[in-house]
């Protein structure tokens, strides 16, 4: 029994390991970049094998990440991880933005065409689904406690868009 209690924290830990524990790690403007293999050619650093990007409030993992040294930006496919406590999956990363992103926290689910890796992260072209609302918004800011949407159109029922509410701003708290 005691043995299982010691293993419990390991089993409850996220699937990705800390970026600092990878064999190759370097510090970038956006946080720690790490992976199992590292190569460098003409200003492009390629990190492969459980590649990761991590800083407080952000932990991403991808098959590989390219760091474009001169621009300070990134290229990566199929990312997963967390941002400000929101679980996320993204089809890709270009520069300092995640592309075609799915986010989830509590009862809220969101999709964004782009998620800028600012502090806090800002989404563009957002669709948010709460238990009672479906919302399309031009922009959203995601924090650990809320999703703040600007310039949006809401459908308050799952029955479709027969009823629409247009507003300048709305705040959805994470439960």
Task: Kindly label every feature range from the protein language model.
Residues 18-175:
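Structural signature for solvent-exposed beta-strand/loop edge elements and short helix-capping sites
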Residues 6-13:
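Bacterial N-terminal signal peptides
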Residues 1-3:
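Positively charged n-region of N-terminal signal peptides that target proteins for export
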